[in-house]
Amino acid sequence: MKINTVLFDLDGTLINTNELIISSFLHTLHTYYPNQYKREDVLPFIGPSLHDTFSKIDESKVEELITSYRQFNHDHHDELVEEYETVYETVQELKKQGYKVGIVTTKARQTVEMGLKLSKLDEFFDVVVTIDDVEHVKPHPEPLQKALQLLDAKPEEALMVGDNHHDIVGGQNAGTKTAAVSWTLKGRAYLETYKPDFMLDKMSDLLLILSDMNRS
């Protein structure tokens, strides 16, 4: 089956928001729980929804913590977000070749749009599914299924690209092929345990993989 659709995670996959996310968590947690959290403590918080993460920390303050996080994240967004090499060129080429491309993210739409605008990727994506659009987040298949439906695409003709196990398992649950990115903060070996179909060392590897898949 040939691939005609590519779905991407956003944070840590298309744009480097790692420092923004870590700083947002540390700011929020230092505000409410001084001297209790270090950088390494917040790394596992990257991937799940803010609600899931903060519920485990203090269920009575979830909305307050989310508000604090999002305010800091918004205020410091443009200074802390960086690009990944070959991402822009790869997405541009996918569009040129006629692929359907979409984003499936556990982030709120407002900050998604900020990131896409800053990286100039906003012109390329036909569909962007955010946490605001679904009841269940990755690895539940709902966000991917919604994106595929909006793109009029079949799961067996789609590839999900991401930097977290939520992306890989989400793709598997939705019935797509999966590609993990080796630049994940979680480490290449960690993602390999979830058995993605492909591992990208840089985003442009995707073009070669798709070319090989669609030739066979």
From Swiss-Prot:
Cystine crosslinks: none
Q: What class of enzyme is it?
A: hydrolase
SUPFAM superfamilies attached to this UniProt entry: HAD-like (SSF56784)
What InterPro entries is this protein classified in?
A: HAD-like_hydrolase_sf, HAD-like_sf, HAD-SF_hydro_IA, HAD-SF_hydro_IIIA, HAD_2, HAD_sf, PGP-like_dom2, Pyrophosphatase_Ppax
Identify the Gene3D superfamilies for this entry: HAD superfamily/HAD-like, Putative phosphatase, domain 2
Please provide an example of a Pfam family that matches this protein in its UniProt record: HAD_2
Q: Which cofactor does it need?
A: Mg(2+)
GO terms in the biological process aspect are: DNA repair
TM helices/strands, residue ranges = none
| One of the record's GO molecular function terms | inorganic diphosphate phosphatase activity
Q: Does the keyword Magnesium apply?
A: yes
Catalytic residues?
A: D9
> Highest taxon of the source?
Bacteria
Q: Can you supply one Gene Ontology CC term for this chain's record? A: cytosol
Which keywords, in A-to-Z order, does the entry hold?
Hydrolase, Magnesium
Query: What EC number(s) does this enzyme carry?
Result: 3.6.1.1
> What reaction is this protein's catalytic activity?
diphosphate + H2O = 2 phosphate + H(+)
UniProt xrefs under PANTHER family: PHOSPHOGLYCOLATE PHOSPHATASE, PYROPHOSPHATASE PPAX
Task of the protein: Hydrolyzes pyrophosphate formed during P-Ser-HPr dephosphorylation by HPrK/P. Might play a role in controlling the intracellular pyrophosphate pool.
Q: Which family does it belong to?
A: Belongs to the HAD-like hydrolase superfamily. PpaX family.
By what name is this protein known? Answer: Pyrophosphatase PpaX
Source organism of the structure? Bacillus anthracis
